[in-house]
């Protein structure tokens, strides 16, 4: 099954799309961490990226949201090449890229509500941001999102009072608060117990469907990735070795991606 990059096709979903074309990343010249990565995601889809540790999965997501600079290639978010942007234009483009982090990245001393409202910082003036003065419509939207993630009763609680699963729910609400065109999740379940991991993946899939945006999840748990995704991208040593629907992912593919058979036992 082919998933070739096609910006025109991606734009057919209200321009909420991500197109990665021939992406390459080198930290040391001549030694690529990402090698010629190309794919397109659009619409209300959930895509799982699997592969061994150190294979470039997190680097890929960090290139997409420009936390790090790609060495070559293009990354189009809603048809705009974010690799070509700088300054104000880049900051505005990054509003459209929601990010859920492995370690939550919450401001521990702030309340749950204040952390969710941080998702609007790119939309308000610097003085409003400094004083944490948000429009009432943003506050109303934040309450709605806390209800969506099951934390309506925790709005005034400090972030450092929450469990890991609750913190990740806040992180998801904060990312959705940006009104992103795409949502990236970097190992969102790696620090969570099995039950909470399932709940977080269910929530991410619900975000894709309810917000009509593509969700791209870097995940270490192959079973979870298969269960909650519409598509699986398998990576090894900076290259894409598999790109298809979950039902097509067989043990032979997993041996190729992860190397050897021991881990299948």
UniProtKB/Swiss-Prot annotation:
InterPro entries: AAA+_ATPase, ABC_transporter-like_ATP-bd, ABC_transporter-like_CS, ABC_transpr_PhnC, MetN_ABC_transporter-like, P-loop_NTPase. It is a peripheral membrane protein. ATP binds at residues 51-58. Keywords: ATP-binding, Cell inner membrane, Cell membrane, Membrane, Nucleotide-binding, Phosphonate transport, Translocase, Transport. CDD domains: ABC_PhnC_transporter. Pfam families: ABC_tran. The keyword Magnesium does not apply. The complex is composed of two ATP-binding proteins (PhnC), two transmembrane proteins (PhnE) and a solute-binding protein (PhnD). Part of the ABC transporter complex PhnCDE involved in phosphonates import. Responsible for energy coupling to the transport system. Belongs to the ABC transporter superfamily. Phosphonates importer (TC 3.A.1.9.1) family. The keyword Magnesium does not apply. GO terms for molecular function: ABC-type phosphonate transporter activity; ATP binding; ATP hydrolysis activity. One of its GO terms (cellular component) is plasma membrane. It comes from the Bacteria. Its EC number is 7.3.2.2. It comes from Nitratidesulfovibrio vulgaris (strain ATCC 29579 / DSM 644 / CCUG 34227 / NCIMB 8303 / VKM B-1760 / Hildenborough). The gene is phnC. Residues 18-262 form the ABC transporter domain. This is Phosphonates import ATP-binding protein PhnC. SUPFAM superfamilies: P-loop containing nucleoside triphosphate hydrolases (SSF52540). It catalyses: phosphonate(out) + ATP + H2O = phosphonate(in) + ADP + phosphate + H(+). PANTHER family: AMINO ACID IMPORT ATP-BINDING PROTEIN, PHOSPHONATES IMPORT ATP-BINDING PROTEIN PHNC. It is found in: Cell inner membrane. Its main location: membrane. Signal peptide: none annotated.
């Amino acid at each position: 099954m082919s998933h070739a990059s096609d910006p025109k096709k991606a734009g057919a979903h209200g321009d909420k799309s991500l197109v990665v074309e021939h992406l390459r990343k080198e930290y040391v010249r001549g030694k690529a961490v990402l090698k010629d990565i190309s794919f397109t995601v659009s619409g209300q889809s959930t895509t799982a990226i699997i592969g061994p540790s150190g294979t470039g999965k997190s680097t890929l997501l960090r290139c997409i949201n420009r936390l790090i600079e790609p060495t070559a290639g293009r990354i189009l978010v809603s048809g705009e090449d974010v690799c070509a942007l700088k300054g104000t234009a880049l900051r505005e483009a990054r509003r459209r890229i929601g990010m859920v982090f492995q370690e939550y990245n919450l401001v521990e001393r702030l309340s749950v509500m204040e952390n969710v409202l941080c998702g609007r910082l790119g939309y308000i003036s610097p003085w409003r941001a400094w004083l944490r003065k948000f429009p009432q419509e943003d506050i109303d939207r934040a309450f709605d999102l806390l209800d969506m993630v099951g934390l309506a009763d925790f709005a005034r609680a400090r972030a450092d009072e929450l469990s890991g699963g609750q913190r990740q729910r806040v992180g998801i609400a904060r990312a959705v608060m940006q009104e992103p065109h795409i949502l990236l999740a970097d190992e969102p379940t790696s620090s969570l117990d099995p039950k909470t991991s399932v709940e977080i993946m269910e929530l991410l899939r619900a975000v894709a469907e309810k917000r009509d945006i593509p969700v791209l999840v870097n995940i270490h748990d192959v079973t979870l990735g298969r269960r909650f995704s519409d598509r699986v991208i398998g990576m090894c040593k900076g290259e894409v070795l598999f790109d298809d629907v979950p039902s097509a992912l067989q043990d032979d593919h997993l041996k190729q991606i992860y190397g050897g058979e021991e881990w299948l036992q």
